[in-house]
Amino acid sequence: MSINIDIKKITDLLNSSILFPDDLQELLREKYIVLERKSNGTPTVAHIYKTMARFDNKSIYRIAKFLFMNRPDVIKLLFLEDVEPLLPYKSINISINNTEYPQLEGPIGTKIALLELFNAFRTGISEPIPYYYLPLRKDINNIVTK
C-alpha cells in the first residue's frame, strides 16, 4: 500500500491561515476581539484582548495604534503617532491579506479610518459589554461559508 503525500501541498495549506473549528470555537468564547480587515472588508486576523478597550485609560487608542501599525497614513490621520501600541493576548489568522490598502487622506480618509476602527471591535459572547463591541458571529459565519 502506497500513500502519496505531497509535503508542499500540506505546507501551503497550513501556511494559508485556515480557520480551524477549534479556532472558531475559541473566538466565539472570547469577550474582547478586534478584527483586522482587508481593504474590501473581509476579516483577516482576530486579535484577542483580555481587557476591554476603554477611553478613560486610553487603551482604545493603544489598540487602534496596534491595529493600524502597518498603515502610517491612518496613524497620522487619527493622531496616534505618540501612542504606544497595546499588543493582543493572542491573534488568530482568519484569511490571507495580500491586498494593498488605498492611501487615506483628508476628511474622507479620516471618516473611512474611523469607520474601519469602530467596526473592528467584536465580542463572541452575549454578556453586557459597551455598545461599541458588536457580535462576532456574522463575520465569522461569512468567512466559514465562503
Swiss-Prot record:
Disulfide bonds: none
Signals that turn on the gene: Expressed in the late phase of the viral replicative cycle.
Gene Ontology cellular component terms for the protein in this record: virion component
Main subcellular location of this protein, as a coarse class: virion
Keyword annotations from UniProtKB, A to Z: Late protein, Virion
Compartment(s): Virion
Self-association and partners: Part of a complex composed of the kinase OPG054, OPG092, OPG100, OPG114, OPG115, OPG142 and OPG157.
Biological function: Late protein which is part of a large complex required for early virion morphogenesis. This complex participates in the formation of virosomes and the incorporation of virosomal contents into nascent immature virions.
Family of the protein in this entry: Belongs to the orthopoxvirus OPG114 family.
Entry protein name: Core protein OPG114
